[in-house]
């Protein structure tokens, strides 16, 4: 009986470790990827930077990308 319980626990541990490894593999978004405001989704040394888009004075939504931390884009003067 103890052998069956220990075998079951060992299998559960192995399955859990495989699942955690699969979640960690490719879990972050690379530079230039579209992200949400969740900063944890971008890879290390990247942050999720968002800006609001306007067309002819009307807001067209918010766009977010993973960019290097500290990098800022600004509108080019026309």
UniProtKB/Swiss-Prot annotation:
Query: Which GO CC annotations does the UniProt entry carry?
Result: extracellular region
Source organism, top-level taxon: Eukaryota
Report the PTM annotation: Contains 4 disulfide bonds.
Q: What is its main location?
A: secreted
Q: Signal peptide span per the entry?
A: 1-22
Coiled coil regions in record: none
Q: Which residues form the propeptide?
A: 23-26
GO function terms (MF aspect):
toxin activity
Task: Tell me where it resides.
Answer: Secreted
Q: Which UniProt keywords apply?
A: Disulfide bond, Secreted, Signal, Toxin
- Record's family? Belongs to the neurotoxin 19 (CSTX) family. 07 (U7-Lctx) subfamily.
Q: What is this protein called?
A: U7-lycotoxin-Ls1e
What species is this protein from? Lycosa singoriensis
